[in-house]
């Protein structure tokens, strides 16, 4: 019997992780190892997928302008932070990988007056509230990251507190319908996989249904007033 590459990858996911609750510290260690590769792969302007698929729709929903003070969640090497800075916004950008933040600061040094890069843990409410500054954030954004975060409830709750009244939170994520086995769709689970071919370590993905994600939004106090789906 012959198996396609997709069949083998799905079997690998099931063997390595489905149903396990792999934690934040393990994920953090993986991203420390992947940081240099990720910075090299994303470069100054991000990769084609982010530039052509993710960024246009996120920017359409976020509608950034020079008056904005924006929280960039799980910022990686800061490619979207610098994109916002180019449009005049001020940004606080964080990631839980110290190595990634070091690389972001180095790569985006020309935006030092507009972007403040920080290390913070998106699963820890106190760590997140430590990002509070004298001015409330007008907007918050997360590009293709919440599926990499062990527990997003503390994040959603803290972001609501950090935003000004009627502030905007935009996040992009994989569509959960198309990245897991149908019978597993309603069951939160985690698995190992890669995002970019050649990365040193497989990262951990945390599957949640759209229902799970939206209910967390509602519990935090958000009202969903925009939703965009796009094929990759």
Language-model region placement:
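Conserved class I S-adenosyl-L-methionine
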Residues: 3-65, 79, 83, 103, 168-197, ...
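Class I SAM-dependent methyltransferase SAM/SAH-binding core
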Residues: 69-126
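A short acidic, Gly/Pro-enriched loop at the edge of an enzyme's catalytic core
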Residues: 128-140
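A short SAM/SAH-binding and catalytic strip from SAM-dependent methyltransferases
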Residues: 138-153
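Acceptor-substrate binding/catalytic loop of class I
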Residues: 173, 196-211
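Short alpha-helix
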Residues: 204-227
